[in-house]
């Protein structure tokens, strides 16, 4: 489709049209909100890439470091931000989501902190989208949640707890890291099967095999980045399992 200008869906956003979008498949509506970091040097380079026809990537919004919000794709259309992904049985996450790219260098710039003003804008934008589409708290996600085998954004420095305190997403206070039993790559048995079942029940794409394989390790890292960021090592320790168990226990109370 052509990159024609349009009226911003979000009040206060600046429009910078990207040609990288299409119709949502089968009339799908947004039910997920996916947050990314750009992983590039600055906003200008990220927006240039997201608007390049050759790149074939995009997002609905970019939030710059100073809090400026730029809309690239209208919310009605399918932006190309999720790629090969999965959440709660959905494999075409692009058709079912709104994507927000948050300007942050990630590993390129040694994982800088997210500025407070930027996070304030992210919160306001998320609230608007969540209200408009009645997005469930459990469906406010990081890219690594839906693609743990290939993505790590928005990273362990992203302040998910701050968003939760503002009414966005699902979160519980992470359990303290201590000693005790743990499961790691190469182990197998019923405890591993039970752990995989809990991850799958929450929404992650994982096969319940009873074997702690590379996929299980990657999903564990994704879970830790979002919900137990103090230590991201892919080991299912007591803290990780307890945090996951308490998240599942609060699902019924979510609105």
Where are the language model's segments positioned?
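Active-site-adjacent loop/helix surface patches within enzyme catalytic domains
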Residues: 2-138
């Amino acid at each position: 489709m052509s990159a024609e200008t349009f009226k911003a869906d979000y009040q206060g956003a600046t429009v910078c049209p990207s040609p990288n979008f299409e119709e949502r498949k089968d009339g799908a509506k947004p039910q997920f909100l996916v947050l990314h970091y750009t992983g590039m040097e600055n906003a200008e380079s990220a927006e240039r890439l997201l608007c390049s026809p050759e790149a074939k990537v995009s997002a609905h919004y970019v939030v710059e470091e100073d809090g400026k919000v730029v809309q690239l794709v209208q919310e009605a259309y399918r932006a190309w931000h999720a790629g090969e992904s999965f959440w709660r049985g959905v494999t075409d996450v692009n058709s079912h989501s709104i994507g927000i790219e948050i300007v942050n260098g990630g590993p390129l710039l040694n994982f800088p902190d997210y500025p407070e003003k930027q996070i304030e804008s992210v919160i306001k934008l998320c609230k608007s989208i969540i209200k408009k589409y009645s997005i469930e708290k459990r469906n406010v996600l990081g890219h690594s949640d839906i693609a743990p085998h290939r993505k790590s954004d928005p990273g362990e420095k992203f302040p998910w707890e701050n968003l939760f305190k503002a009414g966005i997403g699902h979160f519980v206070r992470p359990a303290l890291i201590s000693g005790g039993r743990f499961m790691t790559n190469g182990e197998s048995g019923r405890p591993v099967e039970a752990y995989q079942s809990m991850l799958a029940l929450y929404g992650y794409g994982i096969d319940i095999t009873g074997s702690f394989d590379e996929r299980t390790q990657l999903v564990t890292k994704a879970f830790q980045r979002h919900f137990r960021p103090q230590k991201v090592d892919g080991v299912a320790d007591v803290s990780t399992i307890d945090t996951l168990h308490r998240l599942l226990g609060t699902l019924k109370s979510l609105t």
